[in-house]
């Protein structure tokens, strides 16, 4: 609740949260962004976190489907390859997504290749996005691509090929971050594709208006602030 309310009060509609990956100790880029190592604990903690986000009026985004925690490579700078079987992934990494699907407004897939399942990375894979996420898990919310500038997306080709692969696999919106030239290239390509508006994206709009003044007047914010101060030993 606290994160969501303060982000909304800053004028931002939503955060790409929470991380549903497992903290296996293998992935440094996931690391302590994950709630825990065990799927059940991740599911319980993430469910509470998302309920708080919803209470504050913010939509949720679970990432990185179907799980980034079991690869050492960083998808920002490399193309990670997960060598496990589908059965192993289902038993571990996929569990938080399956258990939390009712609280998820959006999902962000991983730029990871699960080579024994599909040769394409998850964000460009119809199998992962359509067969598993939409079909088996029954997810009907928004699918965001992860940042298409990342090295993990390079397996699909150049920026135009990455966009085509993401949209073709089932992404509702693509992300192109921290690279203005590639963002302009993406916009031009999308105009050529004549991509129309997607009604699913309306789910991501804020559901409650917060301002800094309203937040400071909120009893719930006051209680949360006091709790944080007690936990950290710091008064703001």
Kindly give the residue locations of the regions a language model identified.
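Active-site oxyanion-binding pockets that recognize sulfate/phosphate
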Residues: 32-39, 83
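Charge-patterned, long linear interaction tracts outside catalytic cores
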Residues: 225-236
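Surface-exposed, active-site-proximal loop segments in enzymatic domains
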Residues: 25-35, 74-77
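Glycine-rich, aromatic-flanked loop segments that form ligand/cofactor-binding clefts
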Residues: 3-22, 42, 49-66
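Second-shell residues forming the walls of enzyme active-site clefts
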Residues: 47-199, 207-214, 219, 230
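Short secondary-structure boundary segments
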Residues: 1-9, 126-131
């Amino acid at each position: 609740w606290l994160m969501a309310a303060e982000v909304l009060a800053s004028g931002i509609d939503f955060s790409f949260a929470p991380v549903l990956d497992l903290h296996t100790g293998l992935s440094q880029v996931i690391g302590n962004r994950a709630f825990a190592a065990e799927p059940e604990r991740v599911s319980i903690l993430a469910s509470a976190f998302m309920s708080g986000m919803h209470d504050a009026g913010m939509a949720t985004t679970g990432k990185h489907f179907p799980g980034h925690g079991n690869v050492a490579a960083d998808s920002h700078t490399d193309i990670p390859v997960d060598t496990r079987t589908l059965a192993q992934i289902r038993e571990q990494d996929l569990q938080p997504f399956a258990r939390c699907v009712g609280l998820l407004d959006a999902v962000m897939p991983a730029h990871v290749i699960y080579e024994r399942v599909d040769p394409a990375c998850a964000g460009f894979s119809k199998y992962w996005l359509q067969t598993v996420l939409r079909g088996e898990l029954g997810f009907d919310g928004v699918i965001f691509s992860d940042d298409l500038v990342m090295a993990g997306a390079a397996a699909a080709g150049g920026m135009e090929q990455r966009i085509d692969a993401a949209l073709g696999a089932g992404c509702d919106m693509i992300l192109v971050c921290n690279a203005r030239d590639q963002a302009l290239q993406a916009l031009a390509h999308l105009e050529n594709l004549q991509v129309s508006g997607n009604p699913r994206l309306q789910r991501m709009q804020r559901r409650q208006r917060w301002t800094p003044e309203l937040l400071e007047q909120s009893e719930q914010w006051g209680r949360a602030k006091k709790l944080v101060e007690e936990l950290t030993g710091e008064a703001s």
